[in-house]
Amino acid sequence: MSSNDRDHRRFNSDHHSFWPNPSTYDLNSKIMLAAVASLSGVILIVFALHLYARFVLRRRREAFRGLPVIFRHPFEMPKRGLNPTVIASLPTFTVGATDGVAASATECAVCLSVLKEQDKARELPNCKHIFHVDCVDTWLTTCSTCPVCRTEVEPRPRLEPEPREGPVGTAPQLLVETRLNLTVEAASSSSSDNKTVVSPASRLNSFRKILTRERSSNRINHSCPDQDRVADLERH
């Protein structure tokens, strides 16, 4: 065997080892195409979902803008504390026997300590609960209700009675007079009704009396000629 044949065989073996088998190449290409296609499909699906989400959010924003202001904020915001001027206007006093407040029986619900004599306290106008001035003032800066009963601390406006026309004493007198007039009218109407009921009975009785009188007179008249005839016969 010559050296040329050996070189040619070596070249062919090197060539086959460098270039893969066509069947494996086709398999790898198919796998690559499937991966690219699947990745492209996932990208398209994600893009479609993104567009759909943007569309839905835009529709919701437009619908939300079209609603009235009342429906945009269905939940009320928590109320803040009172104005410092309102807090300062609340009544204060010094705890002691002269104020009518027993120091040992009253407890501040904010600091959970008993009110002592000569302590400066504040009374809430609507619920009449008593606290230390410093304690309740600190509470009212962040909350507008009583710490105990949750009643609004801000003083309520007093409703003044409407002025009445005319003196007050005239109304009962008018009522009494009208009642008296009604009773007099009722009595007169009842008496007139009684008269109208009794008058036919009295007329009937008088008519009966007249009839009896006429009958008695007729009987007397009929009996008188008979007696005259008897007297004449006796004479003859």
Swiss-Prot record:
Top-rank taxon: Eukaryota
InterPro entries listed in its UniProt record: Znf_RING, Znf_RING/FYVE/PHD
Compartment(s) of residence: Membrane
Membrane topology: Single-pass membrane protein
Presence of the UniProt keyword Zinc-finger in the record: yes
Keyword annotations: Membrane, Metal-binding, Transferase, Transmembrane, Transmembrane helix, Ubl conjugation pathway, Zinc, Zinc-finger
Molecular function per GO: ubiquitin-protein transferase activity; zinc ion binding
Zinc fingers (RING-type), renumbered ranges: 108-150
Location (main, coarse): membrane
Transmembrane regions: 31-51
Catalysed reactions, semicolon-separated: S-ubiquitinyl-[E2 ubiquitin-conjugating enzyme]-L-cysteine + [acceptor protein]-L-lysine = [E2 ubiquitin-conjugating enzyme]-L-cysteine + N(6)-ubiquitinyl-[acceptor protein]-L-lysine
Biological-process GO terms, alphabetical: protein ubiquitination
UniProt-listed Enzyme Commission number(s): 2.3.2.27
Functional pathway: Protein modification; protein ubiquitination
Pfam family, one: zf-RING_2
Function, in words: E3 ubiquitin-protein ligase able to catalyze polyubiquitination with ubiquitin-conjugating enzyme E2 UBC8, UBC10, UBC11, UBC28, UBC29, UBC30, UBC35 and UBC36 in vitro.
Entry's free-text remark on domains: The RING-type zinc finger domain mediates binding to an E2 ubiquitin-conjugating enzyme.
Family in the record: Belongs to the RING-type zinc finger family. ATL subfamily.
This protein's name: E3 ubiquitin-protein ligase ATL41
Top-level taxonomy: Eukaryota, Viridiplantae, Streptophyta, Embryophyta, Tracheophyta
Gene: ATL41
